[in-house]
Design a protein with these regions (language model features):
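A surface-exposed partner-binding patch
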Residues: 1-122
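Compact, glycine/acidic-enriched structural inserts
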Residues: 125-158
Length: 158
């Protein structure tokens, strides 16, 4: 497993890009405050660097609520969204931190649907975000990677 210092990218972090997207947001957005210790712990569990959009969301936020909480993007966890990205997946999609996962739960919506990053276990392109609606057992390919999914959630028509 990579150490925290290996996961924190100070030369080319993705957070400034996310801040640009936040400034363009067409939907109401609430960035939940992070707890530094939880952010570090969740980043280690995910093993994703802050150079990636996912790593930056985990490390810089307690989560992101879009459209008054209609869509909830997992970060490092907070009082309003008490689930960290890494912790939420352990026991659900992974046996332990950094273990391979068929998919990785990244967000959910108020209707009861789940969004997951395909780790190769869903029928479709690995790395794409998939949606599991509450009324069907079929995962649907959103045809976007994590970064494009977050950008769509912020500026697109939900």
């Amino acid at each position: 497993m990579k150490t925290l210092s290996e996961l924190i990218n100070t030369t080319d972090p993705a957070w400034p890009l996310i801040q640009e997207w936040l400034a363009e947001a067409a939907n109401p957005v609430e960035i939940l405050p992070r707890n530094p210790a939880a952010a570090e712990s969740e980043l280690i569990k995910t093993q994703v660097t802050t150079r990636s959009v996912m790593g930056a969301v985990v490390y810089e936020t307690g989560g992101i609520l879009i459209d008054h909480g209609w869509l909830r993007i997992l970060g490092s966890g907070s009082a309003k969204l008490p689930r960290g990205l890494g912790s939420w997946n352990i026991g659900r999609t992974q046996a332990e931190p950094a273990a391979p996962a068929p998919y990785y739960l990244i967000a959910d919506d108020a209707a009861g649907g789940y969004f997951a990053l395909n780790g190769g276990g869903l029928d479709g392109i690995p790395g794409n975000v998939f949606y599991l609606p509450p009324d069907t057992p079929e995962w649907e390919d959103c045809e976007k990677g994590y970064g494009d999914f977050l950008h769509w959630a912020l500026v697109g028509d939900l």
